[in-house]
Amino acid sequence: VKNIILATIMGFSGISSVFAECTYSFDATLTQLQSLGNTSVQKFPTIIGNKFSYKTSQQSSIYTAFSQDYLKRVLAANDSQAMLYTRGDKILPTTGIIAFEYKIKVPTLGNTGYVNIFPALSGGIMQNGKAVNFIVAYQHGPTTNNFYIQTTSNDSALISNGFNLAPEVTSDGYQKIGIYINQNSNQVGLVFNGVNKGYFATFPSKLDNLYFSLTSNYFDLAATDANKDVSIEYLLDQSKITQTYPTGTKDICGVAL
C-alpha cells in the first residue's frame, strides 16, 4: 500500500512539474532597491506577475525591480563592481537555443519631457567568469523616440552591433521584443514585432545563468502627457512567447516553444 501511495504522489508531482510556469521572481524589497545608492527609487506602482506598469504624471519618478535573491548577493559583496561577477539566479540550458520576450506599451507623447526604460536588463556570468548583459532600452524625448538593443560585456572578445528601432504601429498597441540566445554558437538574436532581425552579437563563452532587472523613469512632462500608461512585461514561459524563433528554440526553463 505504501508503494502505491508513493507512486501516486510521485505521479502527481510529475504532472505538476509539467504544468509549472516558467517565471522569475522580482521580489526585492524597497530597502534593498534603495541600498543600491538611489534613495528616491520606488517599486513599480502596479505589479502583476512579471508585468510592471505605471501612469505618467508631471512629477518625476523612478521605478526599479530586481529579484531578492540576486540583489541580496550583490549587496553582500559590498563592491560597486559586484554585478560583474555575481551569478544570475536563473540557471539556463547550456545547449540549443533559448528565448524570452518583452511586451512593452509606450505612450504617445508630445515633444516635452522624457520617458525612459533604461534598462530592461537580462545578464549573467559566462562560463569563463566574465559578465554579459542583454540590454533593451527605450527613450522618448524632445528629439528621440526609439528602442535600443545592445549586448555588453567586460570581456573584450564580445562582438556586438546592436539596433536602434522606432516603435511601430501594432494591432494591440504593444511593442514585442524577443531575445534568443544560441548556446551552441554563442550568439544572440532579435525578433522585433514579428520580424526576425537575425544575430547581432557573439559572446565568447557559454552562458549558464541569468538575472533580470528593470528600471524606468520620467520627468519634465507636459500636462497633456500626464496619466499615460507605460508597461513592461517579461514573457518567459513558452505558453506566453508569441513570436517565431529558429526551429527547436525553448524557453529559459528548457521547454520547447
Question: Can you describe what each PLM-predicted range is?
Answer:
Residues K43-I47, S53-T152:
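Secretory/extracellular carbohydrate-interaction modules
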Residues G173-N182, V188-L190:
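Short tryptophan-centered beta-strand motifs in secreted/extracellular beta-sheet-rich domains
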